[in-house]
């Protein structure tokens, strides 16, 4: 919720001490409302006032930290409205359905995309590790291999026992993408115990919303929403609805970063996956999962991302 300067001034200490660098408390509060300075410049706000103001001014979309990466935290739909805050990140998928040689080749290839463009490192930030096995040891071994790349992980696993085994062999730079309307309680308990972000997926957007509400009621707001649908059209509609519901309608239950798996939407078609990835770079994926990331794919995607997430105010 956007507060006006007068709203903030009503809760201010009204000392006019000038310690913040502004001539009056009213001037300071106007700057806070404009986003020019932060509240912590004034040491005299009461704890109660700070709690009220921080709650009211918190972004409608939460920032979720995964290791060194920050996801979400956006305050606008489009860059020209103000600026976009945290760039989307790319992942390459491996799965227990793949043979060992394929997995090894994919993990080796993703590490070859690592270069600098205009002072920014361009590389594959995540490995997306899928599971179609009932054997926890098999999945844990694959996760261990993926973790050895040094990249953060997204663990797509809906089996609680397999997820437990996987989390034992990797660090905390992980999203456990495993909560569904059927298993959310068990997955929530596991993610909370391990201190990792929990990914949430459902067959449709209504069930996704209901599951998020249940997780929030259980005390978990360290969430990422997997909005991947059956088609690219459905997925784009999901991503757009989730972002607009949070930013425009002010509904914080959809105010979380999102995952889009273009590897599922265009399986085996690298060109179409790249096209889809560019679309979801613009609207509105926080993590985009692909089957591969070659230099031919990376150069246009990372260039596009850097252009979109450059602050137009600077």
Residue ranges: model-predicted function:
Residues 2-4, 30-60, 64:
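Non-heme iron-sulfur electron-transfer modules
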Residues 3-15:
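Ferredoxin-like iron-sulfur electron-transfer modules
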Residues 10, 51-80, 85, 89-96, ...:
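Surface-exposed amphipathic alpha-helical tracts and adjacent flexible/coil segments at the periphery
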Residues 12, 32-37, 107-118, 146-150, ...:
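Structural signal for hydrophobic packing residues in well-ordered secondary-structure cores
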Residues 41-42, 116-127, 222, 249-256:
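Flexible, glycine/charged-enriched surface loops at secondary-structure junctions
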Residues 182-314:
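Catalytic alpha/beta core domains of metabolic enzymes, predominantly
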């Amino acid at each position: 919720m956007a507060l006006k300067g007068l709203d903030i001034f009503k809760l201010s200490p009204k000392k006019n001490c000038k310690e913040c660098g502004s001539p009056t408390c009213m001037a300071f509060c106007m700057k806070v409302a404009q986003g020019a300075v932060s509240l912590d410049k004034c040491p005299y706000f009461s704890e109660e006032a700070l709690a009220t103001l921080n709650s009211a001014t918190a972004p409608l979309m939460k920032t979720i930290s995964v290791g060194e990466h920050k996801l979400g935290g956006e305050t606008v739909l489009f860059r020209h409205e103000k600026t976009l805050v945290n760039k989307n990140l790319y992942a390459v998928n491996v799965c227990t359905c793949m043979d060992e040689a394929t997995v090894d080749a994919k993990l080796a290839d993703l590490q070859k995309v690592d270069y600098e463009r205009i002072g920014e490192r361009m590389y594959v930030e995540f490995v997306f590790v899928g599971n179609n096995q009932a054997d926890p040891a098999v999945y844990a071994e694959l996760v261990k291999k993926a973790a050895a790349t040094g990249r953060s992980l997204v663990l797509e696993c809906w089996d609680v026992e397999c997820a437990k085994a996987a989390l034992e062999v990797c660090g905390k730079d992980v999203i456990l993408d495993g909560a569904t309307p059927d298993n959310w309680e068990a997955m929530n308990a596991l993610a909370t115990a391990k201190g990792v972000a929990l990914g949430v997926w459902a067959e449709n957007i209504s069930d996704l919303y209901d599951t998020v509400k249940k997780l929030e009621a259980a005390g978990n707001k360290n969430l990422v929403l997997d909005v991947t649908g059956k088609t690219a059209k459905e997925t784009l509609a999901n991503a757009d609805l989730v972002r607009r519901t949070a930013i425009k309608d002010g509904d914080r239950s959809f105010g979380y970063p999102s995952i889009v798996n273009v590897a599922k939407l265009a399986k085996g078609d690298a060109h179409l996956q790249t096209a889809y990835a560019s679309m979801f770079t613009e609207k509105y994926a926080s993590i985009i999962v692909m089957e591969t990331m070659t230099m031919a794919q990376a150069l246009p995607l990372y260039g596009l991302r850097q252009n979109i997430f450059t602050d137009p105010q600077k």
